[in-house]
């Protein structure tokens, strides 16, 4: 079962997302997209475990592996170009809990 929000303009993405879970290509997952500063997709569904006893929830935490390095790099470059991120600052400047 897929939950969340999807703007009608992006229903094709919702259908692809649903098919991935319903056809067993993904056990569980989530996707969120902002377009022109507004949330247009925030979907989640499936399970967090192979025994299918724990549903994927809106706030399910997941590890971010190597597949996201390119996207993360582009986001960081954009923040630097907008003077919203200074590479000379420590991580704890932006994320105080990291300094614990």
Which ranges hold each PLM region?
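Short, basic/aromatic recognition patches
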Residues: 2, 9-22
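Extracytoplasmic/periplasmic, Sec-exported soluble proteins
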Residues: 5, 9, 63-68
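Non-transmembrane alpha-helical segments in soluble domains
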Residues: 14, 18, 77, 91-92
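A short, well-structured edge-of-sheet supersecondary motif
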Residues: 18-55, 87-89
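Alpha-helix C-terminal capping/helix-coil junction sites
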Residues: 21, 80-81
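Active-site helix/loop module of the DD-peptidase/beta-lactamase fold
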Residues: 58, 63-67, 81-100
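Short amphipathic alpha-helical face segments that pack within enzyme cores
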Residues: 70-75
């Amino acid at each position: 079962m897929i939950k969340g929000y999807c703007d009608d303009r992006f229903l094709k993405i919702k259908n692809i997302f649903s098919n991935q879970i319903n056809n067993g290509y993904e056990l569980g997952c989530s996707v969120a997209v902002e377009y022109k500063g507004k949330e247009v997709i925030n979907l989640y569904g499936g399970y967090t475990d192979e025994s299918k006893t724990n549903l994927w929830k809106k706030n399910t935490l997941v590890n971010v592996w190597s597949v996201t390095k390119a996207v993360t790099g582009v986001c960081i470059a954009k923040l630097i170009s907008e003077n919203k991120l200074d590479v000379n600052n420590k991580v704890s400047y932006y994320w105080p809990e990291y300094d614990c």
